[in-house]
Regions:
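Bacterial N-terminal signal peptides
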Residues: 5-16
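N-terminal hydrophobic/helix-forming segments and targeting peptides
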Residues: 17-360
Length: 360
């Protein structure tokens, strides 16, 4: 290599590394509207539409029969798949009582007590109807427990009144939510799990140069992860043995909070993306984990390694013999009405997805 070529290479590589990382404003501009879109498991349409609107113009997105949004780019082997899920925890109406209250069933795993006596929204498909999640009986005998079945009140007073409002069995409920900036680079809201993963995939795809790819990469925004990884399972079965490696892009439930002990899942916010080496559903092969760490170090992507609870979409590819290497970011207070994220970790996650797609 000539001195001039070497000099050009030394200049271009740092500039490219810098260009790969989205700005904090880029992160906010994608994440905030996704957070403020509603999509309980099975009703992800509004979130899928929001993602579609933010994809780069060259991306050709398709929706499969399950409702997964899919973008395929590049050709040849190995085939690498990234999966972030569209859905959020919430409730579905299972029955409407004569007194007009709505009986609810959970979609996803969370503590019901977090939602007692809080504002509610019923999503009818046409509009969102305000209501209230019922509290436990304040005059009942001790110990007072969460109501069974859990219910919501929209103020109707009768089943006929609920019907007149256009509310039906099968409609979903959530708590109202918004993206709220906190001090520094942190933010709070509900459904960062997994709108951060969705955001990181969008930001990576925007920076991806299809001409640089030497193989095929598929980006999936999956449905119904919170109720059994159902959308990802459809993708895994459709691709079968063709997939070489899958990367679930999802939350790392961190113990980095004022409340929790630090003996497990202690991955600090603001210190970068996370290689989710071990969770309840999958184990990253050690050789692949080591290779990922070396790649991140070489490309100067902040990366932590940890083990946590929960499962991930990539695990359903295991029945096809596909290794799952989950990519994550640390989150406080997961599956609560007020999760907390550091936007610098979202930057790092988007950058990590990009370098993995291009160079691994």
């Amino acid at each position: 290599m000539t001195r001039l070529a070497l000099l050009v290479t030394m200049i271009v590589l740092p500039m490219r590394a810098l260009a790969q990382q989205p700005s904090l404003d880029d992160v906010r501009s994608v994440l905030a509207p996704l957070i403020e879109s509603y999509g309980v498991s099975g009703m992800e349409g509004p979130v899928r539409d929001a993602v579609s609107r933010m994809l780069p113009a060259w991306a050709r997105a398709t929706t499969d029969t399950a409702g997964n949004l899919i973008v395929s780019v590049g050709e040849g082997e190995p085939l690498v798949v990234f999966v972030a899920h569209l859905d959020e925890i919430g409730f579905v109406i299972s029955a409407i009582r004569e007194d007009g209250t709505l009986e609810l069933k959970q979609r996803g795993g969370f503590f019901l007590s977090l939602f007692e006596a809080q504002p509610a929204l019923v999503h009818t498909g046409e509009r969102s109807v305000p209501g209230v999640f019922l509290p436990r009986d304040s005059v009942g005998t001790s110990p007072r427990r969460t109501p069974v079945p859990f219910r919501a009140d929209v103020g109707a007073g009768s089943r006929a009144g609920v019907d007149a409002m256009g509310i039906r069995v099968g409609h979903t409920l959530t708590m109202p939510k918004q993206f709220v900036p906190l001090a520094g680079t942190r933010a709070t809201g509900r459904s960062f799990d997994d709108r951060v993963g969705c955001t990181a995939q969008i930001l990576a795809l925007r920076r991806l140069d299809p001409k640089r790819l030497k193989h095929r990469v598929i980006f999936v925004w999956s449905v119904r992860e919170e109720i059994g990884l159902e959308g990802a399972r459809v993708v895994a079965d459709a691709l079968g043995l063709a997939t070489s490696r899958v990367h679930a892009v999802d939350t790392f439930v961190s113990s980095d909070s004022p409340l929790e002990i630090k003996t497990f899942a202690d991955v600090p916010l603001g210190s970068g993306a996370v290689a989710r080496a071990l969770d309840n559903s999958s184990v990253t092969p050690p050789a692949l984990a080591d290779s990922l760490v070396r790649l991140a170090a070489r490309r100067k992507v902040p990366l932590q390694v940890g083990s946590t609870n929960g499962g991930n979409d990539g695990s359903v590819f295991g029945s096809w013999g596909v290794p799952d290497v989950p990519l994550a970011w640390p989150l406080r207070y997961a599956h609560s009405p007020a999760e907390v994220v550091d936007l610098r970790d979202v930057q790092a996650l988007a950058q990590l997805i990009l370098v993995v797609a291009e160079d691994w």
